[in-house]
Amino acid sequence: MFFINIISLIIPILLAVAFLTLVERKVLGYMQLRKGPNIVGPYGLLQPIADAVKLFTKEPLRPLTSSMSMFILAPILALSLALTMWIPLPMPYPLINMNLGVLFMLAMSSLAVYSILWSGWASNSKYALIGALRAVAQTISYEVTLAIILLSVLLMNGSFTLSTLIITQEHMWLIFPAWPLAMMWFISTLAETNRAPFDLTEGESELVSGFNVEYAAGPFALFFLAEYANIIMMNILTTILFFGAFHNPFMPELYSINFTMKTLLLTICFLWIRASYPRFRYDQLMHLLWKNFLPLTLALCMWHVALPIITASIPPQT
């Protein structure tokens, strides 16, 4: 039975990811005054299926000088971790209701760094290695602010369980009392998922394609799926943390609809940002974090710790 539960979680995620690629190409197309994919199926709706068939039927080439085991393990690990991070997400009921769901998600996102590092190193290519090193530095750096922002939100929530955030936000979304944190969180999620304007790991102009330059066919598709699964997952987390969807226990499907709409809007924001902004320079990316975001998040975290103590109140759900 539990196996069926897992399958019923994984298949919709993979479908959502497949159609997100289509949405991205359509949105970018219309923003650049062109049509986007419109040949395969009505209005190009079957394009993701055609892409999947093409990628998985091609021969998976491997450079002769690459380290075979790591080269193959890296994309599998990337997708496995991307899917594992969905387990504690309340939609409105999680697959496993963990006591420390937030901590689990942070740990999993930290592990994702290894798949990037292995793929870059195992490819035995200069471009792949530079891309991997950039990705690792960027991901590890932005995880610092993500963790501090999460801590501040959890102080208002009063528990490490994500499900209790639904109850905390019954009267007011947390974006109102913590809007500077929400802004920094959104930008940090962009950097964490390697999206434009922080897509330095894939800098086409300088690094060909970044850490996955030597990958083709199936393994490349796995990296691609992992990246987009992470994008949707990060937007879901943003929705749960700051835009608590309305939840009526007698009609949980209303919650799911509300929650999906908010996640979709945030995902389209990601695509809009990609269409609008040029890529950051690497030093600007690091300065933004270590000199701007980190001091600000630390100050706001201290503020959120001090406020309940000063007003002698306790957070809900303790």
UniProtKB/Swiss-Prot annotation:
Main location: mitochondrion
GO molecular function per UniProt: NADH dehydrogenase (ubiquinone) activity
InterPro entries: NADH_UbQ_OxRdtase_su1/FPO, NADH_UbQ_OxRdtase_su1_CS
Pfam families named among the record's database cross-references: NADHdh
Alphabetically ordered keywords of this record: Electron transport, Membrane, Mitochondrion, Mitochondrion inner membrane, NAD, Respiratory chain, Translocase, Transmembrane, Transmembrane helix, Transport, Ubiquinone
One GO CC term on file: mitochondrial inner membrane
One Gene Ontology biological process: mitochondrial electron transport, NADH to ubiquinone
Segments traversing the membrane: 2-22, 70-90, 100-120, 147-167, 171-191, 223-243, 253-273, 294-314
E.C. number(s) listed in UniProt: 7.1.1.2
Enzyme class: translocase
Function: Core subunit of the mitochondrial membrane respiratory chain NADH dehydrogenase (Complex I) which catalyzes electron transfer from NADH through the respiratory chain, using ubiquinone as an electron acceptor. Essential for the catalytic activity and assembly of complex I.
Xref: HAMAP family: NDH1_NuoH
Name the UniProt record assigns to this protein: NADH-ubiquinone oxidoreductase chain 1
Organism: Canis lupus familiaris (Dog)
